[in-house]
Amino acid sequence: LQHLTTGSALVDQFGKAGNYRGRNLGDVFEEQAKIWNENAELAIRFPFYLRMVTRKVKINKENVTDKSQSGQGARDESFKRLLWVAKNHPNDFYNNIFILPLVGSWKDIWTIMFYDKKFNVNAIEKNILFDVLSNGLQSETHVDLVKKFMPRIKSSSKCTTDWTKETNALAKDFSKFLGISYKEYNKLKASGKAHDFQKIICARKYDELEWKKIPGRDLHLLVNGKFLSNHNLTDSYTSWIIEQPTAKFTGYVFELSKRLREKGLVGGGYNKVTLPIEVKHTLDAQFDQLVKTALEGGKITENVLCCLDTSGSMGSRVSGLKNVSCCDIATSLALFFAKINKGAFHNVIMRFDNTCYPVTLTSESFCECTEQLPHCACGGTNFQGVIDEIVKIRKEKPQIPLKDYPTTIVAVSDMQFNDCGWGGAKATNYDIAKDKLLEVFPKEFVDKIRFIWWDVSSRYGTNGFESKSTDDGSMFISGFDGSIMTLLLGEENVVDEKSGETRRPTAEDLVKKALSQEILNYVQLADKK
């Protein structure tokens, strides 16, 4: 059994956000309206959370967020929801839109204006957004990135797509807004210093490249292609990367895993592959950067047991992504969670399908651990096998102290669970798991155990939820960025607003915490400013 809703539209949508890709505009508008009616203050923040790239956010030269801010990096869904705000609550849109390039990219301002025309919403007053861009040009912190994403003005004959046609027209309008000619506008764009490495490459001055200044995604592409070998740069790059504890990367862990799969390295040790040393060190260093960034957002102080679904349905593709399976997402997230967890289960993953057994990672190398991970796509999805294994250990080895057992259980799965066949027709996996644990553990210990249900967004879609929004021991979440876990699991007890008593956070509390991160606190309803 699963619940059709947690009882809160916002908690439902927060949990399912990882499934939101390329949706119909009407569906997005309907859902944004629903959460606005439930809680407008959090609803205005939700699109910015969806867009946010996990990192410390630079507001200006003097102000940077204290911790890494965690989001979903979901551009399309974020822009469509913001269009709803622009259409229905324009004051709230214009008062907060300056946050968008801070949590995302300066390209986002151009993209949302393009969306406004593409979907015939026609709600945006472009001069107000031009003013945001103009302010960015005057900021020492942001000026070069603003210039980087300004569309170059071209002749109409060279604009052959809807994007180039519309952004070319917008660029011309922006040049008029700035009071400069088209030629001066293009010269202004070219004066930007962001990504100087591209200019060096275009000038064929390869010896002048400074590897540490190349952005993470670009570095990833250069190293995994033929660029280094074609220009005799392999030795130069290798001598640099092997000395780096981390390397820039703001993507998702599964993108690193996908690169390994493309090179023939898969989990389970089925295919032994020797990676070029520069590739291995780059992937390891970029993974370590993702772990470091996540830990800068908070520390996990609990014993977290990560459970990896390796059932047959995990071989299905992820909704909205080409050549990416649920297994790709799940194994990369499981590895990530095992590394950011510093408790008793650091480097431990519990796999489950028809059966269940633990896998202990014996290396700190991302590439080597990926090879160790079990291969997915076999058998059913028996999550209760994890609980049965914990109960079995407790019965057979009662001398193991409670402090060595998990206090949080994370299930990384497509949520296509087997019928439990235990606990009655109205029992969820969450309910059944608690009942089983109560047979061998003290109630006060079981009451402290939390379950995190991480949906890897299969094409089958999510059937429902394992618990309600007001339950304090369960949370449903989805997506590709696992860094939010350090925020959610770093939560201390909260004081109940009604009773004044201290209690554990519910799913509603955790969603509110995610939407109250430092940068999102700048987002306010117009009538509250």
Where are the regions that the model predicts?
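Long lumenal/extracellular ectodomains of secretory and single-pass membrane proteins
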Residues: L1-I329, K339-K529
